[in-house]
């Protein structure tokens, strides 16, 4: 009988061996996968938080190192001064200031006034006669005087000048000259006084609109040069903005009543002392 291959069904021990080999392969693959995976980051320790101290609050009432500069204003009302206040005053002006000398009743101070004087002629024209008969400028005469306060009023004779630039230039030059000659003196610019309604209606260059424009120049120059400015005009201005007829001879120059109002205003608007000085002294005594 020729030989034949006979197939036999595998035994159970071969099946068990195959199963064990498959299980081992799966376990090895799982181990490789686990080794390739990155390890989890270890938990970080919590860092302490630094708390900055709060900035200290500065009380509002603590004064600053540099005091704020007080705004410039015209001379304010103060307690009335007696006439000795005017002992060291030099009054500088034109015919209006000469009228004040004659009709105010003030018998103190020294007067340097020339009829027709202007801010230009005060420095450029030798129209002041000295005691020994020499002719010098008004500015030179004031320079030689011993005074602690200079009260200046000029401008009525310049109202016909073109615009205000020429007036401003000469007025500033005069103020600088007075300051240079008397560096320790109080320079007080007095406002120009208004004219009457009758004079204002004439159509002349001597009118209240021009006077207001010149007063604006004086006020600006006083601030720029560090001088005082006394608004005399408000003492002799009526509700219509004009000089009351009962205060003037001719609508331009003041009579006795007008000069008294002028002097009273000067007495209650003094310079060289705080406006509240009298009240503070009285409070300290009481």
Place the predicted regions along the sequence by residue:
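Hydrophobic alpha-helical membrane-insertion segments, chiefly the h-region
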Residues: 22-32
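Alpha/beta-hydrolase-fold catalytic nucleophile elbow
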Residues: 153, 190-191
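A short helix->loop->beta-strand "cap" motif at the edges of active sites that frequently abuts
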Residues: 182-186
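Catalytic His-Asp segment of secreted/periplasmic serine-dependent ester chemistry enzymes
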Residues: 195-286
């Amino acid at each position: 009988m020729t030989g034949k291959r006979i197939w036999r069904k595998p035994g159970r021990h071969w099946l068990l061996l195959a199963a064990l080999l498959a299980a081992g392969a799966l376990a090895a693959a799982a181990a490789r996968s686990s080794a390739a995976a990155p390890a989890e980051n270890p938990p970080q320790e919590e860092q302490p938080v630094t708390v900055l101290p709060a900035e200290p609050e500065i009380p509002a009432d603590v004064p600053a190192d540099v005091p704020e500069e007080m705004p410039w204003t015209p001379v304010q009302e103060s307690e009335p001064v007696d006439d000795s206040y005017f002992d060291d005053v030099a009054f500088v002006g034109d015919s209006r200031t000469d009228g004040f000398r004659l009709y105010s009743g003030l018998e103190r101070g020294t007067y340097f006034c020339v009829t027709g004087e202007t801010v230009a002629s005060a420095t450029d024209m030798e129209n002041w006669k000295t005691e020994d008969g020499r002719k010098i400028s008004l500015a030179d005469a004031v320079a030689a005087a011993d005074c602690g306060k200079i009260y200046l009023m000029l401008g009525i004779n310049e109202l016909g000048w073109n615009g205000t630039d020429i007036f401003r230039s000469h007025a500033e030059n005069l103020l600088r000259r007075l300051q240079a000659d008397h560096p320790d003196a109080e320079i007080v610019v007095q406002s120009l006084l208004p004219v009457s309604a009758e004079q204002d209606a004439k159509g002349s260059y001597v009118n209240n609109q021009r006077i207001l424009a010149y007063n604006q120049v004086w006020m600006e120059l006083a601030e720029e040069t560090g001088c005082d400015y006394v608004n005399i005009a408000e003492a002799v201005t009526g509700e219509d903005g004009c000089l009351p007829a009962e205060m003037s001879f001719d609508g331009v120059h003041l009579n006795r009543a007008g000069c008294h109002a002028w002097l009273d205003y000067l007495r209650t608007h003094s310079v060289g002392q705080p406006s509240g000085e009298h009240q503070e002294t009285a409070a300290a005594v009481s």
